[in-house]
Amino acid sequence: MKRSASDSPLLFDLPLAPDFSQEQQLMKRGLKHIAGIDEAGRGPLAGPVVAAAVVLDQNDLPEGLDDSKRLTAARREALYEIILTKAITVSVASLSARSIDASDIHKAALEAMRRAVIGLTLKPCHALVDGRDVPPGLPCPGSALVKGDQRSVSIAAASIVAKVTRDRMMIRAGAAHPPYGLEIHAGYATQKHRAAIESEGPVPGLHRYTFAPIKGRFDC
């Protein structure tokens, strides 16, 4: 990986698209199955945080994998189906808004990641985790990669699976709670969502009562 002049690990030059080089470095050490881990839903005012763990087949990597945020919804959906077909194993886990409020979003996201890895049908030799922290309690060693979804195809695959899974959950939540428009914004703090919270109030079990502007203003 090319470094900037400062050689800061946070200021590396990102590749145009994620690749398999991170995984290959680990495989050269004799580690066969490498899991990519990512989550979706840290910032919204409503809904769960969802994590995914994916172990790709190095001989059958899906084409076009990228950070889910850089893909259209249609492309994410298409790649989601391809990942489920081609990956060696995929696992998803989520923590509810109540669980997020009971701890905090950072801890909840790490716990969702841990559960996703545990849910894989085989124990990975190593986990590549998007972000700065490796979840405690993983069943294998792990490495944190800042902007990992733009560096590792395994993490990119996990980001797509987590995002599509959560978006589908929020579409169902939107059908159950029409005033909030959850199927449109997936629970993020859009003007429409904030206005609906003001007029209708937050929904217990759906909204995150520890997040502004809900925090301290409404009873659970």
UniProtKB/Swiss-Prot annotation:
| Molecular function per GO | manganese ion binding; RNA binding; RNA-DNA hybrid ribonuclease activity
Keywords linked to the UniProt accession: Cytoplasm, Endonuclease, Hydrolase, Manganese, Metal-binding, Nuclease
Cystines in this chain: none
Species of the source: Brucella suis (strain ATCC 23445 / NCTC 10510)
The record describes how the cofactor is bound as: Manganese or magnesium. Binds 1 divalent metal ion per monomer in the absence of substrate. May bind a second metal ion after substrate binding.
EC assignment:
3.1.26.4
The task this protein performs is described as: Endonuclease that specifically degrades the RNA of RNA-DNA hybrids.
Metal-binding found in the keyword field: yes
Q: Where in the cell is it found?
A: Cytoplasm
Annotated RNase H type-2 domain residues: 32-220
Q: Which cofactor does it need?
A: Mn(2+); Mg(2+)
Top-level EC class, please? hydrolase
**What's the protein here called?**
Ribonuclease HII
GO CC aspect terms: cytoplasm; ribonuclease H2 complex
Gene Ontology BP terms: DNA replication, removal of RNA primer; mismatch repair
Can you tell me which family this protein belongs to?
Belongs to the RNase HII family.
- What does it catalyze? Endonucleolytic cleavage to 5'-phosphomonoester
Give binding positions for a divalent metal cation.
D38, E39, D130
**In its keyword annotation, does this UniProt entry include Manganese?**
yes
Concerning Pfam families, the annotation shows: RNase_HII
